[in-house]
Amino acid sequence: TLEVGGTFNHFCQRLGIEQAEQKILHSPFDYPNQSLLCVPRYLPATNQNNTLQSLGEMLLPIIEANKGRCFVLCTSYLMMRGLAEYFRENSELSILLQGEMPKAKLLEQFIHETHSVLVATSSFWEGVDVRGDALSLVIIDKLPFTAPDEPLLKARIEDCRLQGGDPFNDIQIPEAVITLKQGVGRLIRDVTDRGAVIICDNRLVMRNYGETFLKSLPNSTRTRDLNKVVQFLQNEKMD
């Protein structure tokens, strides 16, 4: 989880470690066969007024085809509440929303109900372990960059500038990479798990820094076709 782009340089820098032996151990999971990563084509523009509804319209058929069993991890409370409201108005699936009950109870209900959707934000991106058929689809609304006006980050950005560094590449990208890895990591928790991750952010494939994110994620099979996601989730062989 701590490596970014194949190295621990960011982690070592945060701890003030100048020299250290680095070793990355291979995962026991067979990601190419166990998981599919999709960055969909034709994503709604983030500056459109109807972005939330357009995103809901795009995602709901995939969620329903999978009969729930889905985490929707959001980067803002506004998106979290908006998507949950859209799903509740347009689907018969059980839609669970972070904040409506304690975290442990939410997870218990999600696992018990089987065909449910959990819409959540920050606290569910890490430290959550759902194994087996209860969870086979993780959707992430966009890359988890921390707002640059967040006080601690703002101070670190200023310190980086004073030292002649590049705050975006030295701080903001590595931290967003680590957070994204944590979110994606909710899916495959066991060697028998199988499922798909959908990341609704074209910057992964349209911006130069997207490669840093992709290189840091598990080596899942990749697609931009949401139909391929449905096929994969329904255990059909992909072309």
Feature locations, PLM:
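ASCE RecA-like P-loop NTPase motor cores
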Residues: 1-239
